[in-house]
């Protein structure tokens, strides 16, 4: 046995591989190469090499392939539909035909419907009542405004008439005074006193 040649190692991991190769070559030299391995003849059956996997287990290649994931619909997942308002009584139970049975007991749905109808009718009635009240108030205000306007017009006419009467009276007195002065002339005489004698 001689001294083995050393090689420069560029990679630290390749040192282990080199040691293994050296060991194999030294062991084959130690055996002296006394035996020769028999080569397999090509005339044998062409069977594929057996894999280490059993028949029932999937192979690594099958595992590495990506499986298509199943996509579930919203109906299968039971996701509620958005942007829809459905009353509690009208909601369709799962697994039952649509339009057949909405609620377990029909009395409860009838009471719910009656309550809703009463509320709606009450709202409508209250709106009608409010409209009537507002109409009555408007009518009363209109009548009151007409009455006030009539009173104001009457007062205005009274004041106009009184002013006309005053004017006519003042004109008459002035005319009487002027006529008396014209009749008596320029002489200013005392007015004669009326004497009344009793028998």
Swiss-Prot record:
Major localization listed first in the record, in broad terms: nucleus
Coiled-coil region: 129-175
Domain of life: Eukaryota
Protein localization: Nucleus, Nucleolus
GO biological process: intracellular mRNA localization; mRNA transport; ribosomal large subunit biogenesis
One term of GO molecular function: mRNA binding
Region named Disordered: 1-59, 141-199
GO cellular component: nucleolus; preribosome, large subunit precursor
Entry keywords, A to Z: Coiled coil, mRNA transport, Nucleus, Ribosome biogenesis, Transport
Composition skew (Basic residues), residue ranges: 189-199
Bias-annotated ranges (Basic and acidic residues): 141-161
Keyword Glycoprotein assigned: no
InterPro entries: Loc1
Residue stretches of biased makeup (Polar residues): 20-31, 42-54
Assembly, per entry: Component of the 66S pre-ribosomal particle.
Similarity annotation: Belongs to the LOC1 family.
PANTHER family, per the entry: 60S RIBOSOMAL SUBUNIT ASSEMBLY/EXPORT PROTEIN LOC1, 60S RIBOSOMAL SUBUNIT ASSEMBLY_EXPORT PROTEIN LOC1
Described function: Required for efficient assembly and nuclear export of the 60S ribosomal subunit.
Protein name (Swiss-Prot/TrEMBL): 60S ribosomal subunit assembly/export protein LOC1
Taxonomic lineage: Eukaryota, Fungi, Dikarya, Ascomycota, Pezizomycotina
GN (gene name): LOC1
